Amino acid sequence: MKQYLDLMRHVRDTGTKKEDRTGTGTVSVFGYQMRFDLSEGFPLVTTKKCHLKSIIHELLWFLKGETNTQYLTDNGVRIWNEWATEEGDLGPVYGAQWRSWPTPDGGSLDQFALLVEQIKNKPDSRRHIISAWNPALLPDEGVSPQDNVRNGKMALPPCHTLFQFYVADNKLSCQLYQRSADIFLGVPFNIASYALLTMMVAQVTGLELGDFVHTFGDAHLYLNHLEQVETQLAREPLPLPTMKINPEVKDIFSFKFEDFELVDYQAHPHISAPISI
């Protein structure tokens, strides 16, 4: 995936050194965009092996509207554990905003169910948007993630903030706006997750595949990832794999892990790097 390596190289070569919330420090740029034609293959990074199981289970967890880590840990996915309470709670994070956005009358709005119906019935609408950015529920930076959850707020603010679908020539495209992007550890997950989500929505709405467009706000490399970045940039991308989805599934909320099969995934060895909390 040349697009991903180009992003990494661009930030390494032109970015500005900045302090950050974690105290690690970053090299950062503001504003960058990548585009992937989903008809050309599934955009899973090949210059290091990625853990697809975690990507799929996390996406299904979002779509379930869940905000407790139980489903994830039951399926061997621990990527959210550092921020959860002892009970596994994360507060009103992505799943809650996608499926249960709070309304002024004390009720909730299922953004995703409405989105799918709107794409089916009004494909040319410019309102195919889902937002996870709810200012009233953002965490207090001076409080631990766990205490924020106890206060009824998110453990972490959403990094992948807002996404929009677009229909043209019977093809479905998706654009993600990501306000904050950990390029080495997080972005490969984000690309694959939203590419897969686009494929799922296309299937249940009867559309063909268009593009996944990934737009960044603060795109950064952590300073303690720079050695790993050099290792990855020295590797040649391999051919993209193919993602097969069970064609029988017609309801966006009915997908299961077993409905996905990655075919012909060739990748260079995994590269370990510390996560900044």
Curated annotation (Swiss-Prot):
Its EC number is 2.1.1.45. (6R)-5,10-methylene-5,6,7,8-tetrahydrofolate binds at H51, D182, S276. One of its GO terms (biological process) is dTTP biosynthetic process. GO terms for molecular function: thymidylate synthase activity. The keyword Cytoplasm applies. It catalyses: dUMP + (6R)-5,10-methylene-5,6,7,8-tetrahydrofolate = 7,8-dihydrofolate + dTMP. GO terms for cellular component: cytosol. DUMP binds at R21, R126, R127, R179, S180, A181, D182, N190, H220, L221, Y222. SUPFAM superfamilies: Thymidylate synthase/dCMP hydroxymethylase. It is found in: Cytoplasm. It comes from the Bacteria. It holds the Pfam family Thymidylat_synt. Keywords: Cytoplasm, Methyltransferase, Nucleotide biosynthesis, Transferase. The active site is at C159. Catalyzes the reductive methylation of 2'-deoxyuridine-5'-monophosphate (dUMP) to 2'-deoxythymidine-5'-monophosphate (dTMP) while utilizing 5,10-methylenetetrahydrofolate (mTHF) as the methyl donor and reductant in the reaction, yielding dihydrofolate (DHF) as a by-product. This enzymatic reaction provides an intracellular de novo source of dTMP, an essential precursor for DNA biosynthesis. NCBIfam families: PRK01827.1-3, PRK01827.1-5, thym_sym. This is Thymidylate synthase. It comes from Saccharophagus degradans (strain 2-40 / ATCC 43961 / DSM 17024).
